[in-house]
């Protein structure tokens, strides 16, 4: 049986997922699309899913009899309403991050899914599907003893004028917030943000670089450098220091060239290229689970924890040097 998917939001990532579903992955096809920009949705349909129905709203996509599962790739502030609509319709839903722009909104999704009684939500934290992170997790769990510290970095070549300081947490660090929690199997208890010397390449509305300091329940200390105007490329680094050794995230495979008295290899500049395989794997995982009427991968609870942690980090940005506590309620049994 081919899973019929409705896509809500036909911007860049929505179009990417439509292409994946119809041209790269197996077991599914796009049968309905919706976007507030009618020209965007018509173009996406014509280019990528000519047999799909153009539907008037995201809620109508979720309720459609011609849709078995939903993919939400709309503007972040609308994610909550569309995920809740999918849950109300009893349909599996893949939601790009953030699950909600607020912790309260993510909490409402957790409550709705818990009341439904079965997992339906997968959140688009694709780094969990990256081969490098999976290799690193295996080493952390089996080879280097108890983790003590983590040193990480998230660097972008540049960001546009509309990228402002809180987005360094909400759009950038959010990936580290999730993947490091998964890597260490440990929740956060506090956050602190400090700002080193400011780069001259940052525009007026963004503080750059920033260093985020996190502590986990077991006492692991994490420092994450966020540098979104590093100029030289898109660079993700992660090193875990354990009692018996340390382990580092491998860099993407690249040819090493010796030429003109130089030893060099290329560094990627586009985040989509860095994690392209992960996007394919996470969506194929969703299709496989949705065909059984459920969801796998990162949960609504993971999305909620990320939102709570993100809110604490944003608060810490506004109180430089202050340590902000991170408090979570008990995890619902559905997510154990």
From Swiss-Prot:
One of its GO terms (molecular function) is nucleotide binding. Gene3D superfamilies: Dihydrodipicolinate Reductase, domain 2 (3.30.360.10), NAD(P)-binding Rossmann-like Domain (3.40.50.720). It catalyses: myo-inositol + NAD(+) = scyllo-inosose + NADH + H(+). One of its GO terms (biological process) is inositol catabolic process. Its EC number is 1.1.1.18. Pfam families: GFO_IDH_MocA (PF01408), GFO_IDH_MocA_C (PF02894). Keywords: NAD, Oxidoreductase. InterPro entries: Gfo-Idh-MocA_inositol_DH (IPR050424), Gfo/Idh/MocA-like_OxRdtase_C (IPR004104), Gfo/Idh/MocA-like_OxRdtase_N (IPR000683), MI/DCI_dehydrogenase (IPR023794), NAD(P)-bd_dom_sf (IPR036291). It comes from the Bacteria. Involved in the oxidation of myo-inositol (MI) to 2-keto-myo-inositol (2KMI or 2-inosose). Belongs to the Gfo/Idh/MocA family. Homotetramer. This is Inositol 2-dehydrogenase.
């Amino acid at each position: 049986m081919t899973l019929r998917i409705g896509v809500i939001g036909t911007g860049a990532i929505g179009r990417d997922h439509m292409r994946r579903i119809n041209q790269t992955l197996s077991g599914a096809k796009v049968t309905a699309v919706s976007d507030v920009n009618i020209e965007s949705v018509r173009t996406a349909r014509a280019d990528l899913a000519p047999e799909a129905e153009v539907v008037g709203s995201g809620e109508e996509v979720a309720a459609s009899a011609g849709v078995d599962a939903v993919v939400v790739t709309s503007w972040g502030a609308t994610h909550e309403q569309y995920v809740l609509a999918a849950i109300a319709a009893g349909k599996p839903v893949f939601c790009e991050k953030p699950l909600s722009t607020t912790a309260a909104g993510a909490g409402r999704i957790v409550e709705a899914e818990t009341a439904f009684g079965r997992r339906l939500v997968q959140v688009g934290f694709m780094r969990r599907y990256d081969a490098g992170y999976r290799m690193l997790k295996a080493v952390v769990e089996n080879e280097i003893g108890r983790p003590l510290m983590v040193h990480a970095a998230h660097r972008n070549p540049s960001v546009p004028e509309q990228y402002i300081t809180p987005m360094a947490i909400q759009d950038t660090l959010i990936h580290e917030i999730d993947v490091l929690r998964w890597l260490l199997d440990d929740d956060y208890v506090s956050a602190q943000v400090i700002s080193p010397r400011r780069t001259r390449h940052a525009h007026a509305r963004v503080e750059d670089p920033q260093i985020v300091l996190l502590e986990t329940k077991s006492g692991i200390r994490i420092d994450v450098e966020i540098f979104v105007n590093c100029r030289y490329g898109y660079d993700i680094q992660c090193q875990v220091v354990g009692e018996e050794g340390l382990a580092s995230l491998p860099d993407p495979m690249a040819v090493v060239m010796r030429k003109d008295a130089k030893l060099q290899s290329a560094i990627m500049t586009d985040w989509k290229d860095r994690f392209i395989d992960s996007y394919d794997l996470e969506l194929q995982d969703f299709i496989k689970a949705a065909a059984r009427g459920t969801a796998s991968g990162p949960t609504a609870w993971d999305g909620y924890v990320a939102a709570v942690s993100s809110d604490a980090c944003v608060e810490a940005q506004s109180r430089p040097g202050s340590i902000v506590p991170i408090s979570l309620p008990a995890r619902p049994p559905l997510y154990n």
